[in-house]
Amino acid sequence: MSDSLIQIGAGAFAPRPGTRGGRPEWLRIKLSTPSSYHQVRHLVDRLKLHTVCQEARCPNIYECWGEHGTATFMILGDVCTRRCGFCAVTSGRPQAGVDPLEPEHVAEAVETMGLRHAVITSVDRDDLPDGGARHFAQVIEAIHRRIPSTAVEILTPDFRGVPDALDVVLAAAPEVFSHNMETVPRLYRQARPGSRYDRSLSLLAEAARRLRPAAETATTAEPVADHAEPTYQGRIKTGIMVGLGEQPEEVLATLADIRGAGVEILTIGQYLQPTPKHLPVARWVHPDEFAAFRAHALALGFAHCESGPLVRSSYHAHEHVRPKTD
């Protein structure tokens, strides 16, 4: 373990076996529901949209909806074809197809909320031939068409490794492409059945290979060869959770894998058990250890790292990307 990491047990503790355990002081938040919270909820309900804030029981919903007036929209329905052990989203076989009105409804919500940075995620849709890639592209295009100044961040599933799915979403020009690694390789079978560590890492690596920062793309003077792979502008991002039973050494190895894949932006947060049916919390990670993980990530070369007990994938997402100009 890196010398920069605090020793396990120094300020952290594990919940009692068989219980959800009492949360430590650093995870207790004050609940408030200002008017902006109700405005966001009314808008989401009116347009019949889903948000990961609600479906995944995000602890930051009151901060994002109430204080910042932001939300992460979840497209492609509210039923996921996979059953991850940490996720509160309903799993099963989706009964509905893709809503053709959803792209415009999401764009309307983004415009009404005045978002400068919109985050779009989805359930897994393994029942669709392209995993939902084309629908992602349509949502991105609808937002850009309606509000050109808004940056779009997408948090996608792995599309089951379907060929060309990545190009479909990247061709729609999202400002940020994100796919979460979630946890260390050893815990994938219990935490992410249906997903593979190597497949997720390969998706990030391929996206990083295709994506080029805007400045780099603009200054490239090399001629483009016939049949060359397309390259796009944008940034690449991922996130992991801790507290599922991983060891700090495994976290450091995973961070090295992620950075080696070319990822620039990283989030690290505490796993919170959504219901007693989900995986138990193995331990509560102390804020000092989160700070140490962040320091290690920056030393590896990540451009940005949000690391803390309540950090989630889209937490302060707008702060990681330079605002678009009108």
Question: Each PLM stretch: what is its role?
Answer:
Residues V52-C64, D78-S91:
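Local cysteine-cluster metal-coordination motifs and their immediate loop/turn environment
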Residues Y62-F73, F86-P100:
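Iron-sulfur (Fe-S) cluster-binding segments and ferredoxin-like electron-carrier domains
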